């Protein structure tokens, strides 16, 4: 079982021909809604890869909350540890997606996600301690994330932190991370090293390992992933595809990567599998609707001789 402690958001998506300037109004396409949130996306990806997934988080007692829970349950995610918090609105994300590049700009209203406490996480310690891996991000409260990583470490379980969105992190938290997986922007800010190429990605990853993270993967979008791990270091290239929407690409990568890792795959193989899953995801619109099945990922890899 892989347990994800994190956010659940309803995504409100508008495709635009370009991103607006400050003070400017532009026309976009019709509003679309899709279930998302970094935590929920990662749990959804784990389930789509065929592994048992458990979600820990908070939603409101509203229609968005019910829809998000239903969407996770539909692919087999265990949502019994998701709290429906009375008086709080479910998290929402406003997402602008560029028509041509598929790049996005996102503003998140955290809502109930921010009400998840360390005490809530500790209340399900047994579930976390029985997991093969625990994944967390930074869209819920920092104390909740810290509690999840601490429980995983104390139980000898694989601990994975996706430090998104960026927040300053103490070395004490990094020292609880078996795998720290930032993107280039988060790595730049956490390591105080501007990531602009593979050499600087390696420098940032090394700096984060020096602060205590056991292994670091810096995701570089179309540039692939730089791996700075105990077992292997180097670059894993992305698979070239025509991107339509990059929302949830990183979450898809993490869910697929961790799944293969707990199944016993070597780091390079697990990263390549994650890259394949993310490559498929960016060719489809939406967050969870874009996440491929394991069969699709394996077929994609076979077609490319990987």
Residue ranges of each PLM-predicted region?
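Conserved beta-alpha-beta core of the PfkB/ribokinase-like small-molecule kinase fold
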Residues: 120-124, 133-203, 222-225
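Conserved phosphate-binding/catalytic loop of the ribokinase/pfkB sugar-kinase fold
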Residues: 58, 82-85, 95-133, 138
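Glycine-rich phosphate/adenosyl-contacting loop at the front of the ribokinase-like
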Residues: 1-58, 63-77, 242-244
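A glycine-rich helix N-cap at a beta->alpha junction
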Residues: 75-87
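Conserved phosphate-binding/catalytic region of the ribokinase-like
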Residues: 167-172, 198-306
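Short beta-strand scaffold segments in enzyme catalytic cores
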Residues: 44, 92-96, 105, 224-227
């Amino acid at each position: 079982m892989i347990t994800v402690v994190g956010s659940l958001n309803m995504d409100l998506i508008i495709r635009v021909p370009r991103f607006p300037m400050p003070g400017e109004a532009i026309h976009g396409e019709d509003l679309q809604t899709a279930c998302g949130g970094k935590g929920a996306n990662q749990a959804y990806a784990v389930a789509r890869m065929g592994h048992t997934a458990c979600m820990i988080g908070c939603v409101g007692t509203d229609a968005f909350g019910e829809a998000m829970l239903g969407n996770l349950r539909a692919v087999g995610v265990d949502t019994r540890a998701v709290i429906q918090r009375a008086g709080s609105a479910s998290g929402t994300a406003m997402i602008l997606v560029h028509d041509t590049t598929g790049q996005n700009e996102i503003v998140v209203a955290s809502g109930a996600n921010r009400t998840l406490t360390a005490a809530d996480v500790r209340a399900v310690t047994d579930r976390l301690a029985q997991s093969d891996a625990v994944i967390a991000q930074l869209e819920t409260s920092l104390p909740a994330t810290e509690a999840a990583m601490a429980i995983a470490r104390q139980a000898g379980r694989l601990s994975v932190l996706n430090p998104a969105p960026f927040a300053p992190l103490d070395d004490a938290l990094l020292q609880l991370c078996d795998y720290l997986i930032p993107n280039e922007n988060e790595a730049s800010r956490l390591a105080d090293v501007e990531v602009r190429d593979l050499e600087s990605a390696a420098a940032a990853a090394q700096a984060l390992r020096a602060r205590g993270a056991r292994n670091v993967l810096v995701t570089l979008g179309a540039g692939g992933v730089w791996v700075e791990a105990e077992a292997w270091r180097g670059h894993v290239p992305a698979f070239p595809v025509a991107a339509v929407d990059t929302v949830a690409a990183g979450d898809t990568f993490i869910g697929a990567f961790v799944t293969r890792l707990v199944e016993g795959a070597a780091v390079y193989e697990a990263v390549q599998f994650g890259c394949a899953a993310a490559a498929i995801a960016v060719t489809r619109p939406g967050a969870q609707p874009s996440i491929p099945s394991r069969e699709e990922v394996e077929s994609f890899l076979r077609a490319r001789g990987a």
